[in-house]
From Swiss-Prot:
InterPro entries: F-box-like_dom_sf, F-box_dom, LRR_dom_sf. One of its GO terms (cellular component) is ubiquitin ligase complex. It comes from Homo sapiens. Gene3D superfamilies: 1.20.1280.50, Ribonuclease Inhibitor. Pathway: Protein modification; protein ubiquitination. LRR repeats lie at residues 158-187, 190-213, 214-239, 242-265, 322-347, 349-374, 375-400. PROSITE patterns: FBOX (PS50181). Pfam families: F-box-like (PF12937). Its main location: cytoplasm. Interacts with CRY1 and CRY2. Part of the SCF (SKP1-CUL1-F-box) E3 ubiquitin-protein ligase complex SCF(FBXL21) composed of CUL1, SKP1, RBX1 and FBXL21. Keywords: Biological rhythms, Cytoplasm, Leucine-rich repeat, Nucleus, Repeat, Ubl conjugation pathway. GO terms for molecular function: ubiquitin-protein transferase activity. This is Putative F-box/LRR-repeat protein 21. Substrate-recognition component of the SCF(FBXL21) E3 ubiquitin ligase complex involved in circadian rhythm function. Plays a key role in the maintenance of both the speed and the robustness of the circadian clock oscillation. The SCF(FBXL21) complex mainly acts in the cytosol and mediates ubiquitination of CRY proteins (CRY1 and CRY2), leading to CRY proteins stabilization. The SCF(FBXL21) complex counteracts the activity of the SCF(FBXL3) complex and protects CRY proteins from degradation.
Amino acid sequence: MKRNSLSVENKIVQLSGAAKQPKVGFYSSLNQTHTHTVLLDWGSLPHHVVLQIFQYLPLLDRACASSVCRRWNEVFHISDLWRKFEFELNQSATSSFKSTHPDLIQQIIKKHFAHLQYVSFKVDSSAESAEAACDILSQLVNCSIQTLGLISTAKPSFMNVSESHFVSALTVVFINSKSLSSIKIEDTPVDDPSLKILVANNSDTLRLPKMSSCPHVSSDGILCVADRCQGLRELALNYYILTDELFLALSSETHVNLEHLRIDVVSENPGQIKFHAVKKHSWDALIKHSPRVNVVMHFFLYEEEFETFFKEETPVTHLYFGRSVSKVVLGRVGLNCPRLIELVVCANDLQPLDNELICIAEHCTNLTALGLSKCEVSCSAFIRFVRLCERRLTQLSVMEEVLIPDEDYSLDEIHTEVSKYLGRVWFPDVMPLW
């Protein structure tokens, strides 16, 4: 007997509905077998199954799938799928990302604004894109956003928007959300009055504010956020608005333990900013209150601007020097940064850092990561540094040209010695030829 084949095209399934019977002949067997033909109806899949499938699909694929049937279209508009959305806005045909289609933006405004909870805006370097982002922000009235991120992929384009337009749009979100927990508004014209509105409406929920490089925010504005938002766990800001009063506010008995503090120390022109010193008792109060806090400092200074830093014990854990840093400063780091976990030196004045590196290994006993580029260390000193740190040095990234051969070790020998102390194979990084 020739069986009917299953056809994918017409979505047919054959099911045998009879229990197995002893074979008593061809016709008897045929009579006791009931073949049912069922049409596979994808539209009959339960909502929760389709919803799970849709959650793994990119938006465009999800939109195409929603046209399969009415049920799938209903699932397409379920609120769970619209809680997180990134608006991408650009004006350039050569941009590295595609702009969100205007029709989709309008559909979200009409149907899904109330569902949005995790929202970000990614814009290119044009002021027009930032203006468009502000226009959308100003319409976020009937939604309760929990996280908000404003991301400029090139230069900070939000700084090219008029301050009044930006602040007005952002204030709409601050007033209507009531449950903001995380905001990333770095390189924007946000100001002190808008921060007061932020904490007035979201003080109980705000945990992770990132407000570095906001020139219109003063130390008073940051202090208002730290003082009123007792649940802050992370904070990112510029050094010039760091004050002793801020540290004391973050260290109050009612404030939760701070987990992450990122401080950007930036100068575009030498002498433009007079960097003040944070008092040791302020650092001590912070560490006593939050003993496990990661203090991350990014330095983009000229060498003559380091006079203020590292003269006293500083509880920094992650330290990045984006410009040239002198031997003297690195020597102070070794003596006064006992909590240091990670150190990255992008450049120095090409004086060998042998003594400074060994000092860091001896005094910074928590150090687990080191990155060196455009500086010089003798092979002997480098091997001694690695021997002092041994296997706790889990990340070691050093350009080959940093290592200077001496009478004890050549470049061909150094990887064997370093690998022995690290307990794993290690080679210096090499600049590719292309």
